[in-house]
Amino acid sequence: MARAARRSTTELLWDAIRYGWAQPWTARFRGGIVTVVGAVLLLAIATYNATDPSFNAVTGEPASNALGGLGAAISDILMQSLGLSAWGIALLMLVFGVTRVAQADPDADRKDLRQRALVGALGLLALSAVLAAPPPPAIWQLEKGLGGFWGDSLLHMVAAVLSFAHIPGATIIAAILFGIAAIAALGFAIGVREVDPDAIHAAVSNALQPRARPEPEPEPAPAAKPVRARREKAEPAAPRAGRLPPLEADEDETPIAASQPAAAQRAYTPPPAVQDDEDDFEDSLDARPMAIAKPKTPVKESGREAREQQKAFDFEEDAGFQLPELAMLAKSKPRSSEVDAAALRQNARLLESVLAEFGVKGQIDQIRPGPVVTMYELVPAPGVKTARVVALADDIARSMSVISCRVAVAQGRNAIGIEMPNQRRETVYLRDLLSSADYEKASQILPMALGETIGGEPYIADLAKMPHLLIAGTTGSGKSVGVNAMILSILYKLPPEKCRFIMVDPKMLELSVYDGIPHLLAPVVTDPKKAVVALKWTVREMEDRYRRMSKIGVRNIGGYNEKANEAAAKGEHFERTVQTGFDDAGRPIYETEQIRPEPMPYLVVVIDEVADLMMVAGKDIEGAVQRLAQMARAAGIHLIMATQRPSVDVITGTIKANFPTRISFQVTSKIDARTILGEQGAEQLLGQGDMLYMAGGGRITRLHGPFVSDGEVEAVARFLRDQGIPQYLDEVTAGGDEEQEEAIEGAFSGEGGANDLYDHAVAVVTRDRKASTSYIQRRLQIGYNRAASLMERMEKEGVVGAANHAGKREILAPPTPPL
């Protein structure tokens, strides 16, 4: 153990010496070697003489080069190869070496240095080709031109290629191309990456302008104000509400000297101090105002919970029914009202830098923290398309290290909302929503507490205005909990006299807990076949309600109930004159009908999984849903349909067209999101009640659904069952008479009643004397199954005979007489 400790201590000491002291001096030593070699080469080239002994010349005279025979040989090789460009080798080595010695940065990128050296060598070759273009002067002592062997070879090769392409002035064009390449390469090698034309123009203009006469220096200011004092002075006295001041500077910042008079500033403008790019970026963000929305105050309570505890007021109706108490629901934990403004600003800066990396320019103008997500409002620069930012949702989530990110346009503002989950997620409880003043004092007829907005505000929707709701979401997204919260919202508001339910639950798990409550018109339907019968009964109930409303001349259920209550309060009734027939003289007979209307309750049909029903009886379900969605609003009948498979075979075009209000919980793909909402975004949700609510008109709002446990639902259902026995209607699931059901089936297919269709088929068979299923199918333009049913009925009633071995039937009925 001691040996291992000594070894680790030795290694740590060696690393400290190596990286803390030795490595900077090693970098300086290498730079010094490069500098010395460059100086030696420069001296050898400066004292070059073509007559000195070298590899190309053998003489008995001593070398006149300052470095002797070695210097003469090296300088001869460089001059013969590159000509005057050989001077560039020595100069580049001096630049590299001096820079290395001056900086001595151990973290310097060696790869960058190697790249600069390689590009510099290529630049010297291009420069030699440029120098080979003009003819050498008379004092030039070498056989090759001013560019040496490599310069002449490169220039003649490129000129030959251009001449082969019949381009005039090939040599001049080649020299120009090599000149451009040499300038770019050598500039990169010495560290010139960008050239600012405006800076060059300003420098030339300042050089050409006459200098202003120096004025006497002003007296020094009494005292210089530090940076913090100047910032405080620059800020307005009363900052805008909801905006945080810029971050304060450090205590030990260097004071800034007092400002000079205007004349002195015109005479000389000092250059700005050089500072790190990251610090400059952060300072610019600090100085920019960034509004942070204040967290919402706790939801304003309606006082219902206090009244229930004091027993000073009970929610009794005329029939003695008592609404459930809020104490049956779980109480929420207190939320923190403080917002970490520094963390939000830091996230906003990081988000801006991430967007800049993907080429999106803009500015975070507003930050809206919420219980589950925080929305950063990006004001994009002119020319930035919204679709481009929306497409970066996955990349933004990856760069910000969050689970998911949703990007959408902020309604009514020139901003793009970027929604990212909070590090700590708050839970929304149904009790908080039902105890809020928005729910208690709302004017909605069928209020549903959908959840809280991004800012933490309760969101109460009215099912009567929707008028139907389509819900989709995968398993575990919070869909079933959301449906339970919607049902409980109505049960906490309306007694059975005002609202009744028909619940269809093919999965036999989600809605069975409500079985036996007084609000139900029938037991919870779990058989898909009985679900079809229940929907057909709902259609008949809708038509019956329309007949009642037409008798007293009202347009909707609200007007009908109002008149019914007024008539009952006054002890009056309605009278209507109807024609009952004709007398012997042919005159119509009228009678007075007395109508005593009774208030009709609203009817809510809840289907938990419509996909199972579509698999069993897709056409019947779609036809019934279509009729109810188109006509049931005025009759006070509303649908809530939910599915965990939002595919096009379940949510058909007919269903989507009649359900303008939809809710999408988390789905698995963008295709499912487009199927339910018409646009993507639902695949970026967080699950556990996180939803997108699309109201009529296509406006989409992100909501966080409330949590309600199975125990809470069971407690409320048990309380309601204790209030009384439900009054079930057997015909809801047993169905009406056969003729009515067949008529409804014919109405769903758009062909009128079943009897009319059968009479038409008999007329076709007796007139044309042809009896086959395919023939009836073609003539009546109906499906094969319906045509086969009509043929079996005609065989049963003796219109046609049984089919023989060839499938032909004998027509037993007499032919139809001609008209």
From Swiss-Prot:
CDD domains: TrwB_TraG_TraD_VirD4. Residues 275-284 have a biased composition (Acidic residues). Pfam families: FtsK_4TM, FtsK_alpha, FtsK_gamma, FtsK_SpoIIIE. SUPFAM superfamilies: P-loop containing nucleoside triphosphate hydrolases, Winged helix' DNA-binding domain. It is a multi-pass membrane protein. PROSITE patterns: FTSK. It comes from the Bacteria. InterPro entries: FtsK/SpoIIIE/SftA, FtsK_4TM, FtsK_alpha, FtsK_dom, Ftsk_gamma, P-loop_NTPase, WH-like_DNA-bd_sf, WH_DNA-bd_sf. The keyword Transmembrane helix applies. ATP binds at residues 476-481. Signal peptide: none annotated. Residues 207-309 are annotated as: Disordered. Residues 298-309 have a biased composition (Basic and acidic residues). GO terms for biological process: cell division; chromosome segregation. One of its GO terms (molecular function) is DNA binding. GO terms for cellular component: plasma membrane. Essential cell division protein that coordinates cell division and chromosome segregation. The N-terminus is involved in assembly of the cell-division machinery. The C-terminus functions as a DNA motor that moves dsDNA in an ATP-dependent manner towards the dif recombination site, which is located within the replication terminus region. Translocation stops specifically at Xer-dif sites, where FtsK interacts with the Xer recombinase, allowing activation of chromosome unlinking by recombination. FtsK orienting polar sequences (KOPS) guide the direction of DNA translocation. Belongs to the FtsK/SpoIIIE/SftA family. PANTHER family: DNA TRANSLOCASE FTSK, SPORULATION PROTEIN RELATED. Consists of an N-terminal domain, which is sufficient for the localization to the septal ring and is required for cell division, followed by a linker domain, and a C-terminal domain, which forms the translocation motor involved in chromosome segregation. The C-terminal domain can be further subdivided into alpha, beta and gamma subdomains. The alpha and beta subdomains multimerise to produce a hexameric ring, contain the nucleotide binding motif and form the DNA pump. Homohexamer. Forms a ring that surrounds DNA. This is DNA translocase FtsK. It comes from Caulobacter vibrioides (strain ATCC 19089 / CIP 103742 / CB 15). The gene is ftsK.
